[in-house]
């Protein structure tokens, strides 16, 4: 499965559009609290624990989106957008969306 943020895949014409696909992952309050509790992990202004949790949430959102596209018969997703939203106190949502296509 090819996944790209661009609207086209150079050298590979889009033969069919299937529509919007998306995936979400929500990090619960305990995860966020645990991340900030491990503030000693911060080196050079970056928190390895926080980045790891964000990467895992992003991976889950992309996997959900990819699986939805596969079920539609797509072999690529174009125009992918990743969003990070704080929802409620201490909860973070990562969402991925794009257009499922056949190339």
Curated annotation (Swiss-Prot):
Residue stretches spanning the membrane: none
One Pfam family it belongs to: YbjQ_1
InterPro entries: UPF0145_dom_sf, UPF0145_YbjQ-like
PANTHER family, alphabetized: UPF0145 PROTEIN YBJQ (PTHR34068:SF1)
Family statement: Belongs to the UPF0145 family.
Protein name: UPF0145 protein Dred_2155
Provenance organism: Desulforamulus reducens (strain ATCC BAA-1160 / DSM 100696 / MI-1)
